[in-house]
Regions:
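Rossmann-fold NAD(P)H-dependent dehydrogenase/reductase core
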Residues: 1-189
Length: 189
């Protein structure tokens, strides 16, 4: 299983995992993203090969925690157990002064980059085979480190002030900073 396979690390992970001739399950946010991904993946593999090994769990926007549960339901309904789970989905909207929120009222960067994966690991752990080779892999970033090239720009990461992860009763976030929110979401991983 892999999340966040549309581009970058996730996309190349999909290409390399498909070469192993194992069943690969890819979580895709929308029909549009599915079509874009397939068009690119088909440059590397023919459709017959993909029909054997590539399985897409579509319309699964990880910002909505209700969708995360649908992933578990998918595997249970098909009686599928997993050997490897790669949690790679990520979201960043640096520079914004206005937060975006999930269906559950959680700041979007934190909802996707941390909470969705945390929840997914916890609800899938019984479906990951108990073998020495089994893995749960979480990709992250070093921007939470103030000594890294990205971490020394803008506000520093720090979990001492978590008010911007969740909407206040008034519906407002306090002093929202998208860059700080991204760094904090990566620090949580």
């Amino acid at each position: 299983l892999i999340t966040g396979g549309n581009s970058g690390i996730g996309f190349f992970a999909i290409i390399n995992l498909l070469k192993t001739k194992n069943n690969l399950y890819v979580v895709i946010k929308s029909e549009l993203r599915k079509n874009e991904s397939l068009k690119t993946i088909e440059k590397y593999f023919d459709k017959n090969y993909l029909s054997k090994y590539l399985n897409i769990i579509e319309n699964c926007d990880l910002s909505n925690l209700d969708n995360v549960k649908k992933i578990k339901d998918y595997f249970i309904s098909k009686k599928i157990f997993l050997d490897v789970v790669v949690l790679n989905a990520g979201l960043q909207y640096t520079g914004s002064f206005y937060p975006k929120v999930s269906k559950q009222g959680i700041e979007l960067t934190f909802a996707v980059n941390h909470l969705a994966h945390f929840y997914l690991v916890n609800i899938l752990k019984d479906l990951v085979r108990d073998k020495e080779e089994s893995r749960i892999i979480i990709t992250s970033s070093d921007v939470h480190d103030p000594n890294s090239s990205g971490g020394n720009i803008g506000k520093k990461a720090g979990l001492n002030n978590l008010v911007n992860f969740r909407k206040k009763v008034s519906g407002q976030f306090l002093n929202f900073n998208a860059d700080e929110s991204y760094k904090n979401s990566k620090l949580c991983n």
